[in-house]
Regions:
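Helix-to-loop junction immediately C-terminal to a conserved catalytic motif
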Residues: 52
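Conserved ABC ATPase "signature" region
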Residues: 67-68, 115-133
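Conserved ABC ATPase signature
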Residues: 138-142, 146
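A short, proline-enriched helix->beta-strand linker immediately N-terminal to the Walker B motif
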Residues: 157-161
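Catalytic Walker B motif of ABC-type/P-loop ATPase nucleotide-binding domains
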Residues: 163-166
Length: 247
């Protein structure tokens, strides 16, 4: 039986009179990989910020792990975010910290682990992303793809139930981008993490997604598999896939 782990219910959001979300409705199933597609300014990143409580919608409800995010205070939101990992576009590593210290940072901040447990957890997550033994390296010694993978190891270090990827393959060469795509799928299969991917990379979307949700003019205009989207008779979907909508 499928379980809905995230739900956006009639969500509205505007900035300076410009409507970004015009009644967003979307349910995300536990354990799936869902990608959010849409042109620039369609509100994809705002949706993620609303999900983790960095922004509040003007109207509507966002249910995460059976809790209404829009009604939580900051203390409760901080506790809720411990269940969520995020891989940023640029990996967002601390330049002055080693790989080990970067990955250990959220463990020290949020979990009560012994030093041995932290060392084991860091080693395990680096092994999962194919980077065993680089704990002592500094970020400036790493390639772009390695930085992304270290960022991913940090994102899963606290063993979250949900992970958010923001442009995970941007700026990477095709082979490295494919390695990141493979990791997204591999981690979901091994760990059962519910996964949300925000990207303009259609190859990434096609490769990793169980389902895809497309945003246009403040609404979710289509939800389905890649095969369902490419055969959709919704014109804006076809325009986006064919490159006729600026991303």
């Amino acid at each position: 039986m499928t379980k809905i782990i995230i739900e956006f219910k009639d969500v509205y959001k505007s900035f300076n009179g410009i409507l970004v979300h015009n009644g967003i409705n979307l349910s995300i199933i536990e354990g799936e990989i869902i990608s959010l597609l849409g042109g620039s300014g369609s509100g994809k990143s705002v949706l993620l910020k609303e999900l983790i409580g960095l922004m509040k919608p003007d109207k509507g409800d966002i249910i995460l792990l059976d809790t209404n995010v829009t009604q939580m205070n900051e203390e409760a939101l901080i506790a809720l975010r411990e269940h969520i990992g995020m891989l940023f576009q640029g990996a967002a590593l601390f330049d002055s910290l080693t790989v080990f210290e970067n990955i250990a940072y959220p463990l020290r901040e949020h979990l009560k682990l012994t030093e041995k447990e932290i060392q084991d957890r860091v080693a395990d997550k680096l092994h999962l992303v194919g980077l065993s033994g680089i704990e002592k390296k500094m970020p400036d010694e790493l390639s772009g793809g390695m930085k992304k993978r270290v960022g991913l190891a940090r994102a899963i270090a606290t063993e979250p139930e949900i992970i958010l990827y923001y442009e995970p393959t941007t700026g990477l060469d095709p082979m490295t981008a494919q390695r990141i795509n493979d990791l997204i799928i591999e981690l979901q299969r091994k760990l059962g993490i519910t996964t949300i991917v925000v990207t303009h990379d259609l190859h990434c979307v096609k490769t990793v997604s169980d389902r895809i949700a497309m945003l246009h003019e403040g609404k979710i205009v289509a939800v389905g598999t890649w095969e369902e989207l490419i055969t959709s008779n919704i014109q804006v979907v076809q325009d986006f896939i064919s490159g006729n909508i600026c991303v």
